[in-house]
Every structure is written in C-alpha cells, then in structure tokens.
Amino acid sequence: IKLQIQRLIRMKKNGNPAWTERFDEISAEVLRQIDMLADTANEFSTFAKLYTEEPVEIDLDRLLKEEIDLFDSRDNIRFAYMGLEGATVMGPKPQLTRVFVNLINNAVQAIENAQAEAGERGGEAFIGRIVISLRLSTKEGFYDIVFEDNGPGVSDDNRARLFTPNFTTKSNGTGLGLSICRNILEKCDAEIFYSKSFALKGACFTVRFPRKRS
C-alpha cells in the first residue's frame, strides 16, 4: 500500500500528467488491500474468541432464517429454505452466526463470479440458486445443515485443501474463512464436510451439529 501511494505522490510531484489516470486504479487497489487487511484482522480476532465465548441455547431454525434474510434481496440469486422447528443446540451464537454467514457468502460470491464470467464470454445468463436445509441427520443425535448452490463448485484438485489455513481461490481472500469455520464447529463437537450438490450441480457444504441434550 505504502509503495503504491508513494509512487502516486512522485508522479504528481514530478508533473507527470499520467498521475490522474493512475489515481483511480491505485485508489481501487489500495481500498482492496485495506479490505483484505481488515478481513485478516477480523479472522484472527475470531480465532482469539474461540476460547472465551460461553455456549448458549440456540434455535437453529430461527438463526438460519435471520441470516438468509440478510442475503435474500438479490435479483440474480434465488434462495430456498427448508427448516425444522424445535431444532436446538448449544454453542457460541456469534461464532455459529459467523459460520453460517461465511458459507452463504461463499455461495453468493461463487455464483456472482460465475455469472460475471458468463457475461464476459457472451454466454447464457443464469439465475443463481442457493438451497439451505435443516434436518435430522442420519447420524443419531445430530442435525444436518446443508448449504447447496448452482455455482461452479470446488475442483477435485482443491477439495483436499478446502479447510487448510491460508488456502483460497479468491483474489482478495485471506484463506482463513473455512479453516476458522471448522475450528468453531470442532469446539462444539460438530463437523463440516464438502461434497458436490447432486440436485444443483454446484457446491454442497454440510454442517453436522449435535442436538441439545434434554
């Protein structure tokens, strides 16, 4: 960031007329890097809180509906939710909220990137679809929260590294999001795994969470 700003200052000081043309480009890059640094700081802050937040009773159905409502205003993506009333678990609510937001946001970004690439190639436009399901797991005593989309999915080469710290396919990603999600879930005796969506042909992330004991 510092080098780019210094370069811009030198161009202006030396009377280089190109500095005005470079201003927008460098400003956009500086803002992108600032956002990335902020994301990194937030990710490490989340790591620090993993051991300090006390578990509380959480209504999964209500929490998921609240988070979906934050995203369900786009014209280019359709959301569908299949819930389960009375699905309660114990966990740190702010951290679980972060997990769900991260997974939804990843799906949104993957779809929007695919839509943009299709437009650049002159390909056929498509409406994104994200389906989130909350249901009883086939594993006794657990709930499954399934996040599916019709984006490009994850390549076979990248699947093994999905939850590895610092691995990302995003140009401005920190590579900590899914790694932190897994750490949060492991602290709750939960797990997360990836598969290809059979119905939508894109990504499918399943969070398997232990039911609250009565």
Can you annotate each of these PLM segments?
Residues I1-D35:
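Histidine phosphotransfer helical core of two-component systems
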Residues L50-E53, T88-G91, T169:
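Conserved micro-motifs of the catalytic ATP-binding
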Residues E54-I68:
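A conserved beta-strand-to-alpha-helix junction within the catalytic ATP-binding
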Residues R78-T88:
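Conserved catalytic submotifs in the C-terminal HATPase_c
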Residues F142, V154-P165:
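Short conserved segment of the HATPase_c
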Residues G177, C181:
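Short alpha-helical Gxxx[C/S/T] motif in the catalytic ATP-binding
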Residues L185-E186:
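Detector for a conserved hydrophobic position within an alpha-helical segment of the HATPase_c
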Residues A190-E191:
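Conserved glycine-rich
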